[in-house]
Amino acid sequence: EEIGLVWDKIQPSKKKFKIKKILKKIDNFKINKTLINFINWFSAYNLVSRGMVLKMCLGDRKNAIKIEEYKKEKKITRLKFILNKDQKKSLEDLRKFSNTFKVSLLQGVTGSGKTLVYFERIKEILNSGKQVLILLPEIFLTNQFKERFLQFFGFLPAIWHSKVGVKNKRKIWQSVINGNLNLVIGARSALLLPFKNLGLIVLDEEHDPSYKQDEGIIYHARDMAIARASVENIPIHLISAVPSLETYNNVKKKKYNYTRLVSRYSDFPLPETAVIDLEKVSLKNNHFIADETLNLIESFLEKKEQVLFFLNRRGYAPFLICKKCGFKHLCPNCSIYLTYHKQINKLVCHHCGKKIKKEKI
């Protein structure tokens, strides 16, 4: 047996061909016209068949089976945190386009309280009876975000990504399409969930390159999220401390609404920073660190304090690719590329620490 989807009505054809018999109609399996329009646009823009996009949207065909659904959350009365003056202004800027399509960029330095601002917007959308989708660039961020969400709202959101179990995915899918699940936090694939009454999309860390999918159906989740918001005629909020060049350019051209948090929450000071240009500093033989940096490190170590180094790259190669078939090794836990470390001859995940021995390279 196969599950089919009625896509459109056409005039009867005079051609003779066999048509499979319809065994039954699935009552709790219905996609609205808005999502159909988005799938058509997604397919044409990314040069991929509608069938492949539908497969991403529908997932396991057993989604149609009657299963336990999420209970609809009650209205949220208030948050536990109070917004400061700058945050209130940014919130008002985001509210300007509440019931229509508009891309808004919320920019702010790290620790400025951007999350608090869009959490307040989410509260308003949820209380209006509509659904909200929050997109995050990496799978491992969803669990961290889940705890933060629980702290603010008092209930756990649904999490959607490739590592979520089939049973839970079916539960989320059915609850989303029936409108009983109001909020989903997920990675790229959550963008194609069949929401019944979507009211807002939030794309956190919009600058992150992980939003671009390079395998299978190739697309950029940020651009597709904007397209879906346009089709749904709802606002979308892009959140970032360091916006992408594309987003920044659209702000400059007045295409996007823009608001910014210029200071950290509770006026917490930024750390002191200094730039040492190695092209202007003479280094000693076999040294790759300037004397000024070494002296500073020694001063902290003498006080029994710690020093943390951030390196721009670890490992011999950021990923391995097969010349014949194009296969790339992904971490089974995090779904990111494994980095090849030549000294230990292993592929290593820099997120979870997973190591895979590679005999022949």
Residue ranges of predicted features:
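Glycine-rich phosphate-binding "P-loop"
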Residues: 78-79, 103-110, 210, 273-287, ...
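Residue-level "hotspot" positions that anchor or transmit function at local structural transition points
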Residues: 82, 213-217, 285, 322, ...
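Conserved interdomain linker/interface between the two RecA-like ATPase lobes of SF2 helicase motors
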Residues: 227-324
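Accessory, non-ATPase domains that flank or precede helicase/AAA+ motor cores in DNA-metabolism machines
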Residues: 1-240, 247-248, 252-268, 302
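Residue-level detector of flexible, active-site-proximal loop/helix-junction positions
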Residues: 13, 164, 243, 265, ...
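Conserved helicase/translocase motor-coupling segment
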Residues: 307-361
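A polyampholytic, Gly/Pro-enriched intrinsically disordered region
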Residues: 177-184, 279-285, 357-359
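Structural signal for conserved beta-strand scaffold positions within catalytic alpha/beta enzyme cores
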Residues: 8, 159-161, 238, 260, ...
